[in-house]
Amino acid sequence: MNNSVKEKIKGGLVVSCQALSNEPLHSSFIMSKMALAAVQSGAVGIRANTTKDIKAIEEQVDVPIIGIFKNEYEGSEVFITPTYKEVKEICESGAQIVAMDATTRLRPHGEKLDEIIKTVRKEFPNILLMADTSSLEDVKYADALGFDFIGTTLYGYTEATTGKNISDNQFAYLKEVLKSTTTPIIAEGKIDTPEKAREVLALGCYSVVVGGAITRPQEITKRFINEMKKDHLGKS
């Protein structure tokens, strides 16, 4: 089962289908159709947020799902499947892979990531685990904990990495990540062009996750508008 799931996403595109509660596309039905469109176009997997969305997507597609549960807690910056409560819910949702924040930041309620991993391995032995990391330190931490996949998901999205992009300096950071571990690396985070997706696979990543550049029309529209405005700067 686990090897089958791994093989299905190897070398392919996983499309992240998510919409925040304040966005027009926030709907499990809409996300399920977004996932269907992605799979019909060749996506080998889907990344989805919340049990409700995951179950709706499962009814539409038959590909591996990377499940997460975004939840904010006071006193902690960790919000991607932050506590065992969310981890357990996603493990029971039907998702084959559960992704969670694997940074060294303080987790809600003082929970420890190593303890969460031990519990999951015991209670849900068939679930694959993906570490969402932001730094080489995180990658080494996740590697030591035995994650099945390590993602670059949070590089550029934490206080310490604000403004950084995975493609900076010819993907220098990603190259260091790939050198630091033999655990399969899933490139994710600011992979916003087909060229970047192709390059990260060429460098040795196991697979690639793309979200906003495919499934977030507001972000896509803003990119067009911002680029179009450049030609009009200084003109009256």
UniProtKB/Swiss-Prot annotation:
Keyword flag Isomerase: yes
InterPro entries membership:
Aldolase_TIM (IPR013785), NanE (IPR007260), RibuloseP-bd_barrel (IPR011060)
What SUPFAM superfamilies does the record tag this protein with? Ribulose-phoshate binding barrel
Question: Which Gene Ontology terms of cellular component type are present?
Answer: cytosol
Instruction: Look up the EC number in the record and give it.
Output: 5.1.3.9
Give the reaction(s) catalysed.
an N-acyl-D-glucosamine 6-phosphate = an N-acyl-D-mannosamine 6-phosphate
Query: What CDD domains is this protein classified in?
Result: NanE
Q: One GO MF term, please?
A: N-acylglucosamine-6-phosphate 2-epimerase activity
Q: What pathway, per the record?
A: Amino-sugar metabolism; N-acetylneuraminate degradation; D-fructose 6-phosphate from N-acetylneuraminate: step 3/5
Q: Which UniProt keywords apply?
A: Carbohydrate metabolism, Isomerase
A Pfam short name: NanE
Enzyme class, top EC level, equals isomerase
Top-level taxon of origin: Bacteria
Q: Which GO terms describe its biological process?
A: carbohydrate metabolic process; N-acetylmannosamine catabolic process; N-acetylneuraminate catabolic process
Query: Has keyword Isomerase?
Result: yes
> Which family does the record assign?
Belongs to the NanE family.
Q: What does this protein do?
A: Converts N-acetylmannosamine-6-phosphate (ManNAc-6-P) to N-acetylglucosamine-6-phosphate (GlcNAc-6-P).
- What is the protein named? Putative N-acetylmannosamine-6-phosphate 2-epimerase
> What species is this protein from?
Listeria welshimeri serovar 6b (strain ATCC 35897 / DSM 20650 / CCUG 15529 / CIP 8149 / NCTC 11857 / SLCC 5334 / V8)
Tell me what gene encodes this. Answer: nanE
